[in-house]
């Protein structure tokens, strides 16, 4: 086995000196540990997110300690709580303002499926307007569940190439647009 075959295996350590990796792997690794969340909190799940950000659970050890309150400075949105139809366009506009690549975590039963509010004014799942990457069950979910979702998102970012991620998001957005197409009467 020659040097060329040996060096063509990304992810292998060669002594204590260096590790061989592709540029895509390095970018994915760095991106997975520097997710900047934008918390969109509307209900009790927002309180659980505050607990997650405190010292007892320490979201900082996962690289997401910098909550951004400007969507242009964030690349991940956490939808925490009930979303009404009146809020849906605002949430979509905030999602559009996020930095690329964009990630979405739907936290709690209300954000994921409308929760106990099965009424005409409540959106029955945020996945009707945004391409959701990870769902967190619970009403409200424990901080450990939110951290577990963050770890799952990190693994997804590390395993998925940038181009594959872009194609997946575009496919999800096309599905959302197709589902929400207005009825035109001719």
Curated annotation (Swiss-Prot):
Keywords tagged on the record: 4Fe-4S, Cell inner membrane, Cell membrane, Iron, Iron-sulfur, Membrane, Metal-binding, NAD, Quinone, Translocase, Transport, Ubiquinone
Enzyme Commission numbers on file: 7.1.1.-
Residues reported in the UniProt entry to bind [4Fe-4S] cluster: 44-45, 110, 139
Primary site of residence: membrane
Single Gene Ontology MF annotation: 4 iron, 4 sulfur cluster binding
Example GO biological process: aerobic respiration
Cofactor (UniProt): [4Fe-4S] cluster
Family, per entry: Belongs to the complex I 20 kDa subunit family.
Role of this protein: NDH-1 shuttles electrons from NADH, via FMN and iron-sulfur (Fe-S) centers, to quinones in the respiratory chain. The immediate electron acceptor for the enzyme in this species is believed to be ubiquinone. Couples the redox reaction to proton translocation (for every two electrons transferred, four hydrogen ions are translocated across the cytoplasmic membrane), and thus conserves the redox energy in a proton gradient.
Name of the molecule in the record: NADH-quinone oxidoreductase subunit B
Species in which this protein is naturally found: Leptospira biflexa serovar Patoc (strain Patoc 1 / ATCC 23582 / Paris)
Higher taxonomy: Bacteria, Pseudomonadati, Spirochaetota, Spirochaetia, Leptospirales
